Design a protein with these regions (language model features):
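Conserved donor-binding loop and adjoining core beta-sheet/short helix segment
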Residues: 54, 58-75, 84-131, 135-136, ...
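Active-site acidic-Proline motif in GNAT/NAT acetyltransferases
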Residues: 125-127, 131, 239-241, 245, ...
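Intrinsically disordered, low-complexity terminal tails and inter-domain linkers enriched
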Residues: 2-25, 67-91
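Conserved GNAT acetyl-CoA-binding A-motif
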Residues: 145-157, 261-269
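Short amphipathic alpha-helix that is part of the acyltransferase structural core
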Residues: 2-6, 21-65, 171-217
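Conserved active-site alpha-helix within GNAT-family acetyltransferase domains
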Residues: 135, 156-175, 249, 273-290
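Glycine/small-residue-rich hydrophobic helix-like segments
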Residues: 218-261, 265
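Conserved acetyl-CoA-binding loop-helix of GNAT-fold acetyltransferases
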Residues: 130-143, 244-257, 279, 283
Length: 298
């Protein structure tokens, strides 16, 4: 189907803040489509809608589609290999769009994490809000993904989404923090009065693994993915029997000091509910750059 992209926003995505109300919009022609293949033109439409909504709401939400998801082939011949290479994503929609008079006025984007979990995000053009379009989209989603646990990431400064999500039965569950440290601020060398502690470093392509040993036994590790200007710490783990003794701090100090000369910044993600880890990163001078609140319907 061919769509039009129309909005009351100008070329710089500045929108008329006086969005139309329900008495001005005839919803009789409102239809919905479930789409599993995204072409370049549809991707452009959805990107424009997301950008307009972000500017109108003064937030930076993204949606779970990139250019790699776009179907660019024009070969209509059947491919016998497609069925054999079928993936989980092939069985479900990537996006649900709301259409009025051939114009896309809103959509929900779906990212499948595994066979039972999905994340979603949604946008409705400002001039079409307050007409239950978002609620209708959520209703369509509930039928399409009824067997899935749905999680919805919302930027902490998003003032529009929380009330809408609560109306649809979604409530805050966890808060994920993005944290960063500039490597110029890493000055403390790892130190331990315990001579039984040792470290090991293993370098792979674009990744470094740091391990901590006590009495020659591995008691923990962390991974650092290396990018052009930053490193990303993840999978920090200390064996349960050795937790609460400061070994996480020693491991991280060793890792940070080792990579400080190859990265400009080091980033990580942690949930605020993981209080010991969150407090440790703050003690190591990581600062929080953004917070995402996850809503779910359980």
């Amino acid at each position: 189907m061919n769509y039009d992209f129309k909005t009351n926003c100008d070329s710089n995505n500045n929108c008329n803040s006086n969005a139309k109300n329900s008495s001005e919009i005839d919803l009789d022609n409102l239809t919905f489509e479930f789409i599993s293949e995204i072409n370049d033109k549809l991707y452009e439409y959805l990107s424009n809608i997301a950008n307009i909504c972000n500017k109108f709401d003064n937030v930076k939400n993204t949606f779970f589609i990139d250019n790699e998801d776009c179907e660019t082939t024009i070969d209509n011949e059947p491919n016998e290999n497609i069925k054999d290479n079928n993936t989980l994503e092939d069985n479900y929609s990537k996006v649900i769009i709301a259409i009025k008079d051939k114009t896309i006025v809103g959509f929900i984007s779906i990212y499948l994490i595994d066979e039972s979990t999905a994340e979603i995000c949604g946008f409705v053009l400002p001039e079409y809000r307050n007409n239950n379009i978002g609620n209708y989209l959520m209703e369509k989603l509930s039928y399409e993904m009824e067997d899935f646990y749905i999680s919805i990431p919302v930027a902490k400064d998003n003032k529009t989404a929380p009330n809408f999500l609560r109306t649809n039965g979604y409530y805050p569950s966890t808060t994920e923090c993005s944290m960063v440290i500039n490597t110029d601020n890493i000055v403390e060398k790892p130190s331990s009065f315990d001579c039984s502690i040792d470290f090991k470093k293993t370098e792979n392509e674009d990744e470094i693994i740091f391990e901590i040993f006590k009495d020659n036994n591995n008691i923990g590790s962390c991974f650092v993915s290396i990018f052009e200007t930053c490193g990303c710490i993840h999978n920090v783990e200390i064996n349960e029997a050795f937790r609460g003794n400061g070994y996480s701090k020693l491991l991280l100090q060793y890792s940070l000091y080792d990579i400080k000369n190859i990265c400009q910044n080091i980033i990580l993600h942690v949930t605020k509910e993981n209080v010991p880890a969150y407090n440790l990163y703050k003690k190591l001078n990581f600062i929080t750059t953004s917070e995402i609140i996850y809503y779910n319907n359980l």
